[in-house]
From Swiss-Prot:
<dbReference type="GO" id="GO:0005829">
    <property type="term" value="C:cytosol"/>
</dbReference>
<keyword id="KW-0963">Cytoplasm</keyword>
<dbReference type="InterPro" id="IPR008927">
    <property type="entry name" value="6-PGluconate_DH-like_C_sf"/>
</dbReference>
<dbReference type="InterPro" id="IPR006108">
    <property type="entry name" value="3HC_DH_C"/>
</dbReference>
<comment type="subunit">
    <text>Homodimer.</text>
</comment>
<dbReference type="InterPro" id="IPR006180">
    <property type="entry name" value="3-OHacyl-CoA_DH_CS"/>
</dbReference>
<keyword id="KW-0520">NAD</keyword>
<feature type="modified residue" description="Phosphoserine">
    <location>
        <position position="3"/>
    </location>
</feature>
<dbReference type="GO" id="GO:0050104">
    <property type="term" value="F:L-gulonate 3-dehydrogenase activity"/>
</dbReference>
<feature type="binding site">
    <location>
        <position position="36"/>
    </location>
    <ligand>
        <name>NAD(+)</name>
    </ligand>
</feature>
<feature type="modified residue" description="N-acetylalanine">
    <location>
        <position position="2"/>
    </location>
</feature>
<dbReference type="Pfam" id="PF00725">
    <property type="entry name" value="3HCDH"/>
</dbReference>
<protein>
    <recommendedName>
        <fullName>Lambda-crystallin homolog</fullName>
        <ecNumber>1.1.1.45</ecNumber>
    </recommendedName>
</protein>
<comment type="similarity">
    <text>Belongs to the 3-hydroxyacyl-CoA dehydrogenase family.</text>
</comment>
<dbReference type="InterPro" id="IPR022694">
    <property type="entry name" value="3-OHacyl-CoA_DH"/>
</dbReference>
<dbReference type="InterPro" id="IPR006176">
    <property type="entry name" value="3-OHacyl-CoA_DH_NAD-bd"/>
</dbReference>
<keyword id="KW-0560">Oxidoreductase</keyword>
């Protein structure tokens, strides 16, 4: 078996995101300690990880160069926070998206860690200035926001606190590359970071188009899945602009007036309530009933699609 990568990783919280991070770090050869306050939660998480890794290995989708048993041997559980973080080089917090809970966790960590470990939060929208301000080890703090489900979608947004040391960003970036994720540097904090700001802009306009009777919910989803989404799976909106003309300058010369005209027709932020909720819910439930069994089956199908897409993207990388 290959030697474990230097330094250990600690995962705080054994839910879906925590389990996914544990699998990703193990795939890179890192020893992983999974911490939770409830021993039964740890036991359940380790069993879930075992089942998923075995399934991934059978389907040829397991990440990394190590086999499932080798990766599983790198993951252990721990119910004592001080013991868990001893000797760690990276701590990834994965507790629920609650500011006070996360601040409590980081305050506890701040009292017991050394001056070398990276303190990273998986928060999807809480600003680093709200999470880390006042900590003695604030220079070692960063948000590393994964995309759900992290094992199948590689993007990780790295968001610094205003006092985060450049070395913390660099080390976290290198670590994400080591486990074959795709890190992006958010140069300064902003509400919603980058991914959710783009996602919410799409959701907002999608909602308005349905609410105003322009398009049905199902057809709206098709516009993304069979239209924009197919391009955006391989190139982003800015490169799309660049390729859809003779470069970016040409695109802006040709289309900027039309874009501005349409953008001026966008309405206010929707309320996401009332009749439109019922309308969208009805169409979605016709496609996927909202009982646990059907939702789980659809998520499983989604994850299979994402894994196959990930393989295709790897194969299609430009030479």
């Amino acid at each position: 078996m290959a030697s474990p990568a230097a330094g250990g990783v600690v995962i705080i919280g054994s839910g879906l995101i925590g389990r996914s991070w544990a699998m990703l770090f193990a795939s890179g050869g890192f020893k992983v300690k999974l911490y939770d306050i409830e021993q039964q939660q740890i036991t359940n998480a380790l069993e879930s990880i075992r089942k998923e890794m075995k399934s991934l290995e059978q389907s040829g989708s397991l990440k990394g160069s190590l086999g499932a048993e080798q990766q599983l041997s790198l993951i252990s559980g721990c119910g004592n926070l001080a013991e868990a973080v001893e000797g760690a080089m990276h701590i990834q917090e994965c507790v629920p998206e609650n500011l006070e809970l996360k601040k409590k966790i980081f305050a506890q960590l701040d009292r017991i860690v050394d001056d070398q470990v990276i303190l990273s939060s998986s928060s999807s929208c809480l600003l680093p200035s709200k999470l880390f301000t006042g900590l003695a080890h604030v220079k070692q703090c960063i948000v590393a926001h994964p995309v759900n489900p992290p094992y199948y979608v590689p993007l990780v947004e790295l968001v610094p606190h205003p006092e985060t040391a450049p070395a913390t960003m660099d080390r976290t970036y290198a670590l994400m590359k080591k486990i074959r994720q795709t890190p992006v540097r958010v140069l300064k904090e902003i509400d919603g970071f980058v991914l959710n700001r783009l996602q919410y802009a799409i959701i907002s306009e999608a909602w308005r188009l349905v609410e105003e009777g322009i398009v049905s919910p199902n057809d709206l989803d098709l516009v993304m899945s069979d239209g924009l989404g197919m391009r955006y799976a391989f190139i982003g909106p800015l490169e799309t602009m660049h390729l859809n003309a003779e470069g970016m300058v040409s695109y802006c010369d040709r289309y900027s007036e039309g874009m501005k005209r349409v953008l001026k027709t966008f309405g206010p932020v929707p309320e996401f309530s009332g009749d439109t909720v019922e309308k969208v819910n009805q169409d979605m439930c016709m496609k996927v009933p909202d009982d646990p069994e059907h939702l789980a089956a659809r998520r499983h199908w989604r994850d299979d699609c994402l894994m196959q897409l990930s393989k295709l993207k790897h194969q299609m990388q430009p030479q």
